[in-house]
Structures are given as C-alpha cells and as structure tokens.
C-alpha cells in the first residue's frame, strides 16, 4: 500500500514550523488520515486566544480543507476523535460539530485531556474514505 503525504498550505507549514514530527494529512489505501488539528489560523499560522466554539469552528474548517486537499470531503469522514481540555465544553463543541456533519455524523470518540504545550482547548483528528 502506497502512503502519500498531502501538503496543506496553512496547516502543514504550521506543524513543520513548530517542529512537530508528523504529517498533517496522509492518503493511503483508499483512506485519508488527518492528524489532530489545533485551532490554527491558516493565514497567520498562529493559534488565537478565542472561545471554544470559535476554536472548534477553526479546527473543523481546517479539517474540511485537509480532507478536500486529499480528494475527499466532510461527508466521507467515517471516524473522528475529539480531544478537549474541559468536559464542560461538551455541549458547545457538539453545537458546532453537528453543523459540519449533519444527520449522518461519523463514528466518534470524545476524550477529556489535561492540556497541550500551547494555549488551546480543542483538537480533532479524523479518518475519511476517498
């Protein structure tokens, strides 16, 4: 099975700049794998200090760009993992999340984590089919 790294402007370069040893998007075997995405502003490469709803929207907007760059779409996402720093954000994250996935959402895991080296509250990864 061939593995192809997909470069996504505004996302991949942020991870490289931070020295994080991962690929933002990998296409292999008919699937697209999107690494956990923090709420990065694709134009500035910075993680802004905004509320959890705005962070979730930024993460899912970036995810949309990533799956499209790999030849898929959000309606072809089959699995997501949502990482959150405070379980109290569950409803706020879900309010935004459901707007991206509609009536047929993918399988999902919701994980409460401690924190990250940078100041943000939500990160989401996904697997999509091509």
Segments the model singles out, each with a brief description of its role:
Residues 1-61, 65-78, 84-130:
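N-terminal presequence-like segments and the immediate start of the first folded domain
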